Amino acid sequence: MKVAISYPPLEPAPGVPLLGQNRQFQWFSSPTYIYPVVPASAATLLQEREHQVLWDDGIASEKSYTSWFQEIVSAAPDVIAMETKTPVVKRHWAIVDQLKKQLPGTKVVLMGDHVTALPEESLDRSAVDFVLTGGDYDFLLQGLCEHLTGQESVLPPGIWYREGSRISNTGSFQLNQDLDDLPTIDRNLTRWQLYSEENGNFRRTPGAYVMAGRDCWHHRCTFCSWTTLFPTWRRRSPERVLDEVGHLIEQYGVREIMDDTGTFPVGDWLHTFCKGMIARGYNQQVTLDCNMRFDALSRDDYELMKRAGFRLLLFGLESANPETLRRVSKGLTVEQIVDSCEAAQAAGLYPHVTIMFGYPWESYEDALHTLNLGRELLVKGHAYTVQATIVIPYPGTPLFQECKANDWLNTTNWSRYDMREPVMKTPMSDAQVKKLVQGIYNVAFNPEFVARRLLSVRGWDDMRYFWRAGRKVMGHLIDFARE
């Protein structure tokens, strides 16, 4: 069976869509391509089962829609699987319908957090054949293809489909597969080079993405779209992840690896992994980045991670207001945020913080507390970089349900959930929300901030990184200046 895993170009577009491997969707002015780990695992698993796999990322390949469409029609796959998200699902419905007109015998599949939350909607609104729910696209797509080829008589749980004129499903998705059973991702099949340079996280290139777990052991943040995909927590063994790190170093010359697990494993798992990095000598060959929670690690943990080769730790700050931290179930205090940043920085690590503006219950004065904390952490060097965004309540999240219950939604036109404007009612104007986002990125022009960055330069990798980072900052300022 010929199977295409496709990311169609989206035209017209206000920028590059951050779709695959993204918990939030944005259009970026500056080209950014992030390796979609689970779809890449799906491609590898299908190829191992002797299917013919076409890795078809028209976005990262920078194809026009016309070229992409002509090529996919010419290839005539038996199955086309596409990952979608809330702001672009209507575009994908139109693409699905065009594909079904040209390739009526091809089965078209949608997967992602939006269709997991609202699976029946896509079957009602488009000619799509199957909707995969939950985040295990690899296991589910394999099960679907084996069913279509007659190898399995029953579809796995979590699949929605048509049965005549009726919409049916196989029940709730299950996340009970052992992640260590998955094969090592075939990076050549999935064209890893497309994603190895244009990424703001990478200080050294080429870079690569991996995932030690699915997805976050906290998994309670009310705004996170991936809690819809992964309501439970699983992780691979430290040895399997170490083997993948070695594979990326030895086979592809990768110099920086981003582990995009929602929150990297801690405790004994982390200690075993770090000691393995040191024992195998990988800490001398590659730099590691990961997502982490404030107050999850001790100073000794940070120091061990530094010795193991970690560089960038991405923390979700989200707000400096205790009431907001409570309402979105962060389980944090402002003091823990500051202490963790200082401890990580003191160990020689580089904290990156994410901040959001536009909560329905926050006034402009409330949001200024967050802006001021973010600016202070950056200027004083306790945080190295920042990402600021507008809060978007994605379907399937507790925040979306809270918005519906309190009449906080300005619209349910999904295309407007693309972070170019607030879609929740707030005490602030849209212009004020965007001004707050820009206010964080304007720290890049602060003299003390600039001086600290210049003093941190250690070589050509740093200079190239700062050049790329400067372009990204200007892009973000443009992104949130648009009307």
Descriptions of predicted regions:
Residues 120-124, 301, 361-376:
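Catalytic cores of alpha/beta
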Residues 2-5, 72-73, 78, 398-400, ...:
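Radical SAM enzyme core and accessory elements
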Residues 38, 45-46, 51-175, 392, ...:
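Glycine-rich beta-alpha loop elements in corrinoid/cobalamin-binding modules
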Residues 3-31:
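Short glycine-rich His-centered loop
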Residues 78, 129, 255, 311, ...:
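Conserved acidic residues
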Residues 12-16, 267-268, 323, 327-328, ...:
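Flexible glycine/acidic-rich beta-alpha junction loops that bind and position SAM and/or redox cofactors
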Residues 180-181, 185-352, 357-359, 372:
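Radical SAM [4Fe-4S] cluster-binding motif and immediate context
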